[in-house]
Amino acid sequence: MRKYEMLSILDAGTENQSEEIAKIEDVIKNLGGTVSKSDAWGKKTLAYPIRKKTEGFYVLFSFELEPSQTSELRRILGLRAYVYRQLMTVVDE
């Protein structure tokens, strides 16, 4: 397994952000990964509108996942309406 960090921008208009964060953690766990940390950065103004919204809720996830599962994670999160964007990077040890 490899270590990854993923910065996600979620819908800031949703009432329960912790529920959305838990759903993303569940997706990672269902793909065989382990989440070591999820750090909510809070609501921030976007540099440009995304889906006609000007604010997003930023969350940084640290997790381990098999490299073969990263494309599936991107696909699943891309289908979620509450996930505006995500950027996943490999953490060098």
Q: For each of these PLM feature ranges, what is it?
A:
Residues 1-57, 64-93:
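Long, contiguous binding/interaction regions
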